[in-house]
C-alpha cells in the first residue's frame, strides 16, 4: 500500500461521515435511469465509475477503457442502465464504485469555457443551438436577431444567471453531484478529489485491485487569476446564490464557501 494511505483513508472516513449525515435526512430510493446512465461498468474488474463532466473524465475513461469488453456497447464501456435490472442491482451491490468531485466554482467555470468559449463543434454544437439560444433569449437585454438565431457568444454573467434561475438541473455538465451520481441512493466505496487527483487515483487503483495499471500523468489546473477574472463580472449576490444552488456539493465534499472567491465577497468595491 502507498505511504499516503493513512492520510487519504482518514479524509475518506470523514467524507463518508458527511455523506451519511446528509443522506440520513433523505428517503433512500432506487437510482433513476439518468443516474444509471452516468455509471460506466468495467465488468472484468468489477469496477463502476460515475463519470462527472469536467472532473478528469478524459483521464479516467481512456484508462478504464482498456478494460471494456467487446460486447459493442460504446467506446467507453457499457453503462449500468444497459444491463438487465437484476444484474444491474447485483453489480451496484458488489462492484467497487467510485467517483471524483471538484471545487464547484472551478467546475462551473470549466463547463462554461468548454461549452461557450471553446465549443468543440463550433456554432453547430447543441450547447450553442439549444442552451445558448435559450440563455440569450431569457437573460440578455435587447438581444440581436442574429444572436437569438445562432445562440453563439453566451457571456459568463448570462450563463450564471441562467444557472441560478433555472439551469442547474437541466444538464449534467453543471448539475449537483447528487443529481449526477446519486450518492444517497448508491453506496460509493470512494469519492476522490480533482485537486489531489494523482494521489487519489493511485489510492483507487490500489483499493480496486488494479495496481498493475498506472494513472496517466496529470497536473490539475489551478487558474485562480482566471477564476477571479470571470466571477468578478457578476454581482456578489449571485455568488451567494450559487452557494445555495451548489450547497450540497460544497458541504459534503469539504469545499469551503466562498472558497477561492472569498476576496470578491469581502471586497468593498
Per-region residue spans from a language model:
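Membrane-interface amphipathic segments in extracytoplasmic regions
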Residues: 1-269
Amino acid at each position: 500500500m502507498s505511504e499516503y494511505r493513512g492520510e487519504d483513508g482518514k479524509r475518506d472516513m470523514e467524507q463518508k461521515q458527511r455523506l451519511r449525515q446528509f443522506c440520513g435526512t433523505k428517503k433512500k430510493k432506487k437510482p433513476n435511469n439518468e443516474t444509471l446512465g452516468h455509471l460506466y461498468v468495467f465488468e472484468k474488474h468489477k469496477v463502476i465509475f460515475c463519470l462527472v463532466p469536467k472532473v478528469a473524465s478524459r483521464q479516467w475513461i481512456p484508462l478504464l477503457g482498456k478494460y471494456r469488453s467487446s460486447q459493442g456497447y460504446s467506446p467507453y464501456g457499457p453503462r449500468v442502465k444497459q444491463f438487465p435490472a437484476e444484474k444491474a442491482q447485483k453489480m451496484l451491490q458488489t462492484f467497487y464504485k467510485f467517483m471524483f468531485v471538484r471545487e464547484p466554482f472551478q467546475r462551473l467555470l470549466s463547463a462554461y469555457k468548454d461549452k461557450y468559449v471553446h465549443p468543440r463543434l463550433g456554432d453547430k454544437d447543441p450547447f450553442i443551438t439549444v442552451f445558448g439560444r435559450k440563455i440569450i433569449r431569457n437573460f440578455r437585454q435587447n438581444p440581436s436577431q442574429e444572436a437569438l438565431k445562432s445562440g453563439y457568444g453566451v457571456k459568463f454573467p448570462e450563463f450564471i444567471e441562467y444557472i441560478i434561475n433555472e439551469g442547474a438541473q437541466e444538464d449534467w455538465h453543471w448539475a449537483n453531484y447528487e443529481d449526477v451520481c446519486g450518492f444517497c441512493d448508491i453506496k460509493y466505496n470512494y469519492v476522490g478529489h480533482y485537486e489531489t487527483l494523482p494521489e487519489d487515483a493511485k489510492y483507487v487503483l490500489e483499493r480496486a485491485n488494479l495496481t498493475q495499471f498506472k494513472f496517466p500523468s496529470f497536473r490539475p489546473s489551478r487558474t485562480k487569476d482566471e477564476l477571479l477574472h470571470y466571477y468578478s463580472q457578476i454581482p456578489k449576490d449571485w455568488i451567494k446564490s450559487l452557494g445555495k444552488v451548489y450547497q450540497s456539493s460544497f458541504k459534503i465534499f469539504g469545499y469551503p464557501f466562498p472558497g477561492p472567491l472569498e476576496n470578491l465577497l469581502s471586497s468593498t468595491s
